[in-house]
Amino acid sequence: MTQEDSSRGLTSVGRVDFTNRFADRYNEWLGTTGDETKQVEDRVETDSGLPGHDIYGFENEIKSLQHFLLDQKSYKLFKSLVVVGEYGVGKTALCQQIFNDYDVRNAYAPRIWVSMHSNESKEGLDGKICVLKTILKGLGVEESMFESIHREVVEEVSNRQEAGEIDGETAKEKEISALLYALHLNLRWKKYLIVFDDVQEIDNWDEKLDAKLNEGEKWGKYLSDGFPKGSGGRVIYTTRDENLAKNLVVQKHEIHRLWPLSDSNSVWKIYEAMIQKREKESPRNDKKCIDELMNKSRGLPLAARLLAELDPMLFDDGKANQNGSKDGKTDSVDNPNSEESKTKPL
């Protein structure tokens, strides 16, 4: 997962495609309720860089995550937390903000950002193996080590089969166990912070990392074995899936729900900042315009920003009439599938 700023997590081409996909789904999105989690088949690769936009309305959420990471009363304990919320609510941006917080950077080493979606081909690879390799790469482990582990595992399984020995472990399970051991050694005695962004069911990453090994169980069977305890390690997940979130942590209070913004002024600031970034004239910010934006975006920061990127909203009735639109809205908003919407540059 690259640490470089590629338009803050998206390449320029990716942003164009992403904005077009947003336009294609906009009418459908407006019809969903606030309680629904929008599951989109398209995912994007993210990185640890600061979001390329200001964050508004999440002051309390930022303080809550700072407390989770910097609480001196639980300095040595391993703790995990899930940020769960619907598509576009700002989970990734919130975690990027806290990941780069000055005090957090000074308190944790190493800090590793894992985008659960990768643009690299994973065809035929196990989800757990891919994630473990990503973490280990962030710790400086080279590809040659992974090749060596895989080669030794395949050879061991082959030799056992030829000798008629069966130990109940598949080659994949042995490889995962070896990677967990390597991870444990690299994280041992370190106060680490790992963020798993956009965890979904298909990733096959659905175990509690603070689970303890039961008596008689073999080490390396569970993901938790790879994450040392006792040095103050922290893990943060983001996910859209409420049920998956419950599988990732032990206690309910370890689930942090991120809701759409209820403060219409914060939503307007998000929209206005994007308009100004694109050097466009801001619409008047009277109550009618703010309420209309709140209704269209449903309080979702991503929706507010992309509405501005799609060059959609002319709230001024006079300007709207000059452009031949109705009720102060342009055709590109009423029909975001229009060619005008799809060809807007970013």
UniProtKB/Swiss-Prot annotation:
What GO MF terms are annotated? ADP binding; ATP binding
Does the record carry Heme as a key word?
no
What UniProt keywords apply to this chain's record, in alphabetical order?
ATP-binding, Nucleotide-binding, Plant defense
**A Pfam family name for this chain?**
NB-ARC
Keyword ATP-binding listed? The answer is yes
Q: Which domain of life is it from?
A: Eukaryota
Ranges for domain NB-ARC come to 38-116
Q: Which GO terms describe its biological process?
A: defense response
- Where is ATP bound in this sequence? G85, E86, Y87, G88, V89, G90, K91, T92
Location of region: Disordered = 315-346
PANTHER family noted in UniProt:
DISEASE RESISTANCE PROTEIN RGA4, PLANT BROAD-SPECTRUM MILDEW RESISTANCE PROTEIN RPW8
Q: What does this protein do?
A: Possible disease resistance protein.
The name under which this protein is listed is: Probable disease resistance protein At5g45440
Q: Which organism is it from?
A: Arabidopsis thaliana
